[in-house]
């Protein structure tokens, strides 16, 4: 497996584009994105667990009932959520996309991200979609920009792997900076692959992966109304279709995971106002569920996040987060380390503090990427969660989001 350029356009048969059509006031910001497969593709998606769901999710879920799709359209600047006409608007957005691409409306995945509760005016989208379709090409970067809201940078990646003796590619773009606490900010992830895989196996791979990747990311503890992870697989790599578990399915899942973990880290590191990426690795758990819960509890802790912003090795906050995680952990067995490119420091052994250099710890925590290592010393299971520090800028960004 190797990383390649091209994002969602790296796989055979995929093209993309992103333009400014007028949804957002800032003309320098792209606000409409399109991903297109030259042939119909197997498709799967997972969605937010928030009971308040954006209209695009409802429409997309209906469209994917047959496990097929050929395009993904997404606007930024408006979530099309909690609107009386939201379903009709999302359906028309699908129809407009289908008309521009000469495909069926039910083969369009539709997504939106932005402000909740404001009507989505389709006028700029009606004008923009023909232009967007005409601009399709090797423009994954433009599509990545078109789905951004408070993100500071686009997020795209692609990798190549082998399945059935054929070289296959999987790529992805993502947005997410705030309201990131998925159980599947708004967090949107769009993946493309030329690997031939059936819709049921594609769905199995995606749901299995999301549980340990995107559902383990938290920026601010808020679960968005519009979270979606969607994948298209058009089969143009020419491998024998994956229809059951086996070596090829394992290879596909590993490639998928390499893409999703990379995107998880970029989403967490680009949290609103963030200055540091936090990766919490929990080992020594008696079961996987416990490891996941503990890791997520730590990265969700506002006090831990604030301590990381201040480069303060306040390990007691880590123990506190473990204690209220709801798991049955013997805190008297817990070891805690902080690690970064500047080194590693042990701050807690068997649930009690140990002498360490505060200055050394501070230098470790001043790095842009920080690891919180927790050993529960109770078993062989582990899990990883991602988050970011909590800064003054987070409040500033969200205090005037609508203005």
Language-model features: where?
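A structural signal for small-residue-enriched, beta-sheet-centric alpha/beta enzyme cores
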Residues: 1-88, 92, 98-403
